[in-house]
């Protein structure tokens, strides 16, 4: 990206992006993640030589976001504006981008099974957890869950994909990754733990 196309108020990566290791797979490449989590990782890379990079994944919807990211060498810009000023940051910590319905679920599972992946973070909205909000329990009659339980090695739901990836890692002798829900829902950690464990028990 020629710097002459950017405002002097824009911050661009001055560090070697090739040194990044994709240690985090993020499910749900939405605005909150783009403007906050990925920016924090970008600051760490710029100011503290962090090598933690992202693999961005959309499971359902957002096909154009992933397509655009691929066309832009996995770079995108976050703009901050006030009444008197504008600044931008070109975020450079993304190393790969996938869409489950475009690239295939198998490509997503392969990314999750890369040995260096340590964290799977999620901003998939409340609906993505396939749970009953009133109880926090997995909805076993949810269409995605029903389909995944019928074909557990070809999952489409977030719980199904996480469980299948963990099973493959265990079979390959790889350490499990940490699952980190970042959605704005009550007790998000308990919710993701509950639906993942409940789904895994159904698979057994």
From Swiss-Prot:
This is Uncharacterized oxidoreductase in tutB 3'region. Keywords: NAD, Oxidoreductase. GO terms for molecular function: oxidoreductase activity, acting on the CH-OH group of donors, NAD or NADP as acceptor. NAD(+) binds at residues 24-35. Belongs to the mannitol dehydrogenase family. Pfam families: Mannitol_dh. Its EC number is 1.-.-.-. The lineage of its organism: Bacteria, Pseudomonadati, Pseudomonadota, Gammaproteobacteria, Enterobacterales. PANTHER family: MANNITOL DEHYDROGENASE, MANNITOL DEHYDROGENASE DSF1-RELATED.
